[in-house]
């Protein structure tokens, strides 16, 4: 069983009468890329701020690297974060921005800035002032700043928001490189499930401050994969029939639907087997679901802002 690097228990944040985060209990394994999905205003940033120590919970608990309570302030030195945009000095170069952060944290050493710039793909930027960077370059420099001190957990708040396709790809490649080459655990938020599905190993879906679901990438792909959708009155009666046919990959979705993820071409034979068992089938079809459609269905539809 994988080691849990971060857990929250009933984490809550209240602003006056508004509950921005409502009893969120999330679980992040060591070495994971955890995609934190939700619309704008769902509570993502507030949750990340509490985890990073930038805001205090109204209630609930955070456990980080096995520590909680008063020990959190000490252990948060192992957390790097980029929340609500990087704080950059536009007239300075990338190297000088990094040098200032290194000296502030007392981790300055010769060649360290160049090493960090190489990690995020900015090794060749030279002395160009940061104000002349593209938004994608600024985001990658923000990630480099978050890496100062060599954290074990990297927290990124909407790092691809507003980027063009090239910028998104560059940030995505940087995240994958950090995870694969340095075994860094990464908590990354976004409102774009399609993009996070290209890198995430696990997901938490938040809506109106409530964590609706946690699932692995494999579980998400299965939910959205091509399947045979069978509509009938009593799905539980159909289970023995599928067992006799040797069908193993199926899900009783609700009181009227079964999803079958194998032997999709045998729908006619399956329909006949159900009929022989006295189970009337009201509908049977091959279907699949787009990732964004699944997200919108889970959060009640509407436009994903």
Question: What residue ranges belong to the model's regions?
Answer:
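ABC-family P-loop ATPase nucleotide-binding domain
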Residues: 1-12, 301-305
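ABC transporter nucleotide-binding domains
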Residues: 4-6, 13-188, 193-207, 211-213
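Generic beta-strand hydrophobic packing signal
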Residues: 9-11, 24, 250, 284
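Non-catalytic surface loops within mature trypsin-like serine protease
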Residues: 30, 106, 124, 234, ...
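Generic structural signal for individual residues within well-ordered alpha-helical segments
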Residues: 76, 98-99, 114-117, 169, ...
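ABC transporter nucleotide-binding domain
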Residues: 172-261
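Short, charged/small-residue-rich alpha-helical element at the C-terminal edge
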Residues: 226-298, 305
């Amino acid at each position: 069983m994988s080691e849990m690097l971060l857990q929250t228990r009933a984490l809550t944040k209240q602003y006056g009468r508004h509950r921005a985060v409502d009893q969120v209990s999330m679980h992040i394994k060591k070495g994971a890329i955890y995609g934190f999905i939700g619309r704008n205003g769902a509570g993502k940033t507030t949750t990340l701020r509490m985890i990073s120590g930038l805001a205090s919970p109204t209630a609930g608990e955070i456990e980080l690297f096995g520590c909680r309570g008063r020990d959190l302030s000490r252990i948060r030195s192992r957390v790097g974060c980029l929340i609500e945009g990087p704080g950059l000095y536009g007239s300075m170069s990338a190297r000088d921005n990094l040098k200032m952060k290194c000296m502030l944290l007392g981790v300055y050493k010769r060649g360290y800035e160049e090493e960090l710039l190489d990690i995020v793909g900015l090794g060749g930027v030279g002395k160009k002032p940061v104000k002349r960077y593209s938004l994608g370059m600024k985001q990658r420099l923000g990630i480099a700043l978050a890496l100062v001190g060599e954290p074990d957990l990297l927290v990124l708040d909407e790092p691809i928001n507003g980027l063009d396709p090239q910028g998104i790809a560059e940030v995505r490649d940087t995240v994958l490189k950090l995870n694969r080459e340095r075994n860094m655990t990464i908590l990354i938020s976004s409102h774009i499930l399609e993009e996070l599905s290209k890198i995430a190993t696990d997901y938490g879906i938040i809506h109106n401050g409530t964590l609706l679901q946690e699932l692995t990438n494999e579980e998400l792909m299965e939910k959205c994969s091509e399947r045979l959708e069978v509509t009938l009155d009593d799905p539980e009666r159909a289970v023995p029939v599928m067992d006799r046919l040797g069908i193993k990959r199926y899900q009783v979705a609700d009181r009227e639907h079964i999803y079958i993820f194998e032997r999709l071409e045998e729908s006619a034979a399956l329909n006949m087997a159900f009929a022989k068992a006295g189970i009337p089938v009201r509908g049977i079809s091959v279907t699949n679901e787009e990732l964004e459609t699944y997200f919108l269905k889970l959060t009640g539809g509407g436009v994903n802002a």
